[in-house]
Amino acid sequence: MQRLLTASAAVLALALAAGNASAQNFSDLARQDLQATHDALKANHPAAVVPGAASETFRSWIDAGLQDALSKAGQVNSGESHAYLLRYYANGFRDSNIATNPTFEAASPFFATGWPGVATAWRNGEYVVSYVQPGVRGAPPVGAVVKTCNLQPIADFAKAKLDGFEGDLTTEAARVRTAPYLLWNRNNPMVGGVPSTCEFQVGRRAREYKMSPQPATAANLEAAYRASVFTPGATKLSIEQVDGRPWVHVNSLEDNAGWDAFYAQVESQIATLRGAQGLVIDLRGAEGGSVNATSRGYGLANRIWTPEFTVSRQPEAGQITYRATAANRQWFADTLNRMQSDPRFVQESAPVIEQTQAIVAAFDAALAAGQQTFVMPGRPSVADTGAANPVQGKVVVLVDGGCTNGCLDTLDLLTRLPNVQLAGSATDVDSIFIEPTVQRLPSNYSDLSYGHKAWTTRQRGNNQGYVPAQGLTYTGNPTDEAAVRAWVGTLF
C-alpha cells in the first residue's frame, strides 16, 4: 500500500537518506535494503511456513531472487534506481501484497527522461501504437503493432525492460498499466532506454522505424499515457445520468476521495438508483490498497441494496492462518493500542477490539507453545434474512485492470447479487496473504509492505481476479470514453 508523506516528513526522510548516502553509495544502500527485505519476509511472511501452491513462488524466489537482485545492485546510482531494484525483487514474488514503496516523492506515472515521441498500449494481446507526438516525423502510425525492438521479439524485449521493474507482467492488468513505457527511457540503468530501431506491422506490411529520441515534456508524456491507459480524472466519486440511467463513478477507493459527500449523494438519489431503468457502477481505476477500501465498497453496496439484503450474500470468510512471530504479534498489539486510545473507536467498534484482543492472546499462546502458525475462524456465513431485492433493474459493474485489492473484495460481493453483470476488461489479481505490515528499511529510502496472515479458505483463489464473460468484454479503445459509454448502453 503506497504511503503518502507530508511535505515535512518527506524532507526529513530525504535528509536522513542523504546522510546515509554520503557515507555509502546507492549500490550499498540497495544491497542493505534487499537483505533486510529478504530477512523480514523470511522471518515473518506466512508463505514461508504455510503449505500449498500459493506459497510455492515465494519459496522459490525468496533466496534465488535475492541473489538475482544483488547481481544488479552495482548498477544502482540514484534514489530512483534504488526504488527500481527493490521493486524488482518485491514483484518477483508474484504477490500483489508484497511491495516496496519509496519514502520520497516517487516518479510520476507520466515520467520519462527520454522517448521517441511514441507511446504504446496493450490491446488484445499486442503492443499497439496508441499515441504519436504531433510534429514527430518518421514515426509509426497509431494502430501499428510492435513486432521487434533492437532485433529482439517484442515479448522478450518487454519482459527484459518492464517485468519486475515496472510491474508483474504475468498479469493482464500490469501489461496494460506498463505498456506506455515500452519505448521510453524511465531512468532505470538496469534496462535499456529508448531502443534504436523497432519493426512494426502497418496494415499488411512489416516496416522498420528508427526510434529517434524526442524532448520529453511533461504535457506530452501525460497525454501519451492517458491515450494508452484509462486514467480517472480529478473527481473520482460522483453520479451522472448517461442514456437515461445513473452512472455511479467509483474510480477510487482511497480514503481521501470524499466519501461522506459521495455517500450523501447516493442516499439522496436512492430511488433513481433502484429504478427499473438499471444503473452502471463504474469501478475502473478503483485502486483498493487502502486498509479501508473494502469497507468503502461494501458501504456503497449496503446503501444501494440495504445491509439486510447483502449480509447473507457476502462470501464466507472461512479460516485465517497467522504466522506466529514476535514481529507479527507486535503489529496486532500496536493496532490494539491505537484502537483502545481512540474514544470514538471504543464506543463504536467494541466487537473489533474484542476480536483483536483474542488474536493477540492467540499469538501469545502460539509463541509460548513454539508453534509456527495458528488458525482463527473468520466471520461465519449468515442465513438469508428474506429481505426483498430493492433494486428493480439490471446493474452493470464496469471494471478494468485498475480494480485492485479492496476493489476485488467488493466484486466478491457484487457478483453474488441478482441481476448484476460484470463488464469491461480483466481486473488485477491479489494474493491470499493479506493485511499489510509496513516497516521502514535501513536506508530510510523505502518502506516494505507485506501481508502477515493467510486467507487460505478464500473462495476466490490466490492471484485470481475477475475477467468479464464473453460478450461482456470490451475490446475497443479503453481511453475513448464516448465509445465505452456507447458500448455499455448496448448491454441494457
Language-model features, listed with the residues they occupy:
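Bacterial N-terminal signal peptides that target proteins for export
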Residues: 1-8
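Gly/Ser/Thr-rich loop/hinge elements
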Residues: 288-393, 436-442, 451-472
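C-terminal soluble interaction/assembly domains
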Residues: 397, 405, 409-411, 415, ...
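N-terminal signal peptide c-region/cleavage motif recognized by signal peptidases
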Residues: 18-20
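Long, C-terminal catalytic modules of enzymes
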Residues: 408, 460-464, 469, 475-492
